[in-house]
Amino acid sequence: MTSGSLVRAGTGFATLRGMLDIEFAKRAAEAAIDDASAALRELSLDIHSHPELNFEEEHAHEVLTRFLEQAGFEVERSAYELPTAFRATFGSGSPALAVFCEYDALPGIGHACGHNLIAASGVAVGLGLKAALGPGNGAVFVLGSPAEEGGGGKILMIERGALNDVDAAMMLHPSPVDGAWPNMIAIEMLKVEYFGRNAHAAAFPWEGVNALDALVLAYSSISAMRQQMRPTDRVHGVITSGGVKPNIIPDYAAAEYYVRSSTASELAELHAKVAGCFEGAATATGCRLELTSLGRPYREVVTNDVIAEAYCENMGRFEVRLPGRGQQGGAIGGASTDMGDVSQVVPSIHPVFGIPTDAANHTPGFTAAAATPEAHARMIRAAKALACTAIDLYAKPELLASAKREFAAPER
């Protein structure tokens, strides 16, 4: 990292609570991010080339915390009793804003959700705010959250106090398109197991209780049920165990299912229907069913309109016009994230920034795209816009108050 961002530390907000030139502060943040761009690119590629699954992100944790510490942040490693979480702090008092980093990868396809870019973007926003935030003007927390891909790292962090002193939270996520209101829905992850009885499939099939039959019947029942599901509901699964040899009736079969819906309350309704399919198949075949949860359910993302509109305005600084609320078009739809749980606790936004690719998230093509110079440039642009949005919240008490009123409204 160059020294430019460190030299500027605290200059932008010298008179924040007075009549600050907010434009000067934003330019200071943008300059700091630009100064660090080459180092952030190295950081992103380092994480990209060392993909680690959820709760195993030891390398990412090390390089991120070292980078932030060298940049002058006060860093707590292995924060919140999670070995690969961290909290990096600059400043103190109120307002206190949090920006999240994610850095876990996917099995077999590496950083196919671009978490290397998310990690670098969180650091970039932190550097920008450090360059503009002077003494007594509030705090910025860069929070390293492990295990977004199914482990619910942010949920554990929330339960252990990560947001107790936070006024608002934000993060960025790569996507094939740009958007400030991505449709990120609630999810639960289930393990389905059927237990039957072995028998010779040719000589004595009548002595068997076929666990695979139960699983196939449940799979077919769920497929038939889709005709009556809401357009926003999603149920998808894979068979992880279906027997060992064709001439042995399987006494065990298993699958993993993801069940999603627009809200946590609608998810509860859908769960009951899906569970009915699993239970009915057990009854029909005489098998025993075990249905268990794979980690914590994620709640839906509730985008704070006040902050999202400020982000859209700040993206305009770079001649990017984002679609308004309800006009997302091709932005991420139907995916899920534990940032949804954050958005249920404090006013939050989770914008997506488009990187040049025809590939969707969670595909090998997106893995490759997440390492390109073009993707890095888009990340830098979005990080500057997010830092400027945070500056608006620091510098305009009425804006943060409006975001909090929206968050507290019962109809949100």
Question: Where are the regions a protein language model picked out?
Answer:
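Generic non-transmembrane alpha-helical segments
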Residues: 28, 32-36, 42-46, 50, ...
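Divalent metal-coordination and catalytic microenvironments
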Residues: 47, 88, 99, 115, ...
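Alpha-helical metal-binding/catalytic segments enriched in His/Glu/Asp
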Residues: 111-151, 188-194, 201-225, 255-259, ...
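Zn-dependent metallopeptidase/amidohydrolase metal-coordination segment
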Residues: 324-385, 389, 393, 401-412
